[in-house]
Each structure stands twice: as C-alpha cells, then as structure tokens.
Curated annotation (Swiss-Prot):
Protein name listed in UniProt: Small ribosomal subunit protein uS12
GO biological process: translation
Record keyword Ribosomal protein present: yes
Annotated positions of the 3-methylthioaspartic acid modification: D89
Job description of the protein: With S4 and S5 plays an important role in translational accuracy. Interacts with and stabilizes bases of the 16S rRNA that are involved in tRNA selection in the A site and with the mRNA backbone. Located at the interface of the 30S and 50S subunits, it traverses the body of the 30S subunit contacting proteins on the other side and probably holding the rRNA structure together. The combined cluster of proteins S8, S12 and S17 appears to hold together the shoulder and platform of the 30S subunit.
Protein species of origin: Polaromonas naphthalenivorans (strain CJ2)
Basic residues: compositionally biased ranges: 113-125
Keywords: Methylation, Ribonucleoprotein, Ribosomal protein, RNA-binding, rRNA-binding, tRNA-binding
Matching PROSITE patterns: RIBOSOMAL_S12
Pfam family, any one: Ribosom_S12_S23
Region of interest called Disordered, as start-end residue ranges on this chain: 9-31, 105-125
GO molecular function: rRNA binding; structural constituent of ribosome; tRNA binding
Assigned protein family: Belongs to the universal ribosomal protein uS12 family.
Amino acid sequence: MPTINQLVRQGREVEKIKSKSPAMENSPQRRGVCTRVYTTTPKKPNSALRKVAKVRLTNGFEIISYIGGEGHNLQEHSVVLVRGGRVKDLPGVRYHIVRGSLDLQGVKDRKQSRSKYGAKRPKAK
C-alpha cells in the first residue's frame, strides 16, 4: 500500500481497456476485400463447417470474419462490410460480415430476424 506522499508524486495508474475488435479502430463498420473464402470446423463439443472469409480492410488490417446465415455468394475479391462481434466456437474469429450490404447478398427466403440477414420483406399473397 503506497503512502500519501508516494501517491502525490506518482499517482494511480489507470488500467487500459483492451479492445475486443482492434482492427475496427473505433469504427462501427469497416469495408474490406475478401482475400480467401473457406470453411472451418468449430471447437469441441460442436461440429459443423462454418463459413468464414479472410478480409483485408481499408486500414490495412487482415482479419478473419464470419459469414452468417444459410448460403452466400462471396468469392475472392468480393467487397464486404465488416462489423465487430466474435464467434464463440471459432478461435480467432472476432468479426462478422454484414449481410445485404455491398457485394454480399441477403439470405434468400428468410422470414424471421430478416434485418440481421439483409432479407427484404416477402410479398404478401
């Protein structure tokens, strides 16, 4: 425990809060170009082929981001919008790609949670 005199001389050091999505550099979203689109397997106990893309952002960062929803039209050189948000069972994946923006289309025939997947409202019959 420091003395009052030591605190007057030095002061308390404020703990720096580490960002959970450093590549965003305090932006809500970032644009980037896909350098590789592939599938990967999650950690135990889950089992699947998760769709991910390696993206080079406009600020020069190279990140791995998750492609949510069923089916996608991404390939190399696709321009995408990236937001923060990790995928718990994929180590190293700390970003999501925004559906229905730039080159990535929304999920087809999506009825519920449409805004999260960039799907338009279906025509009423």
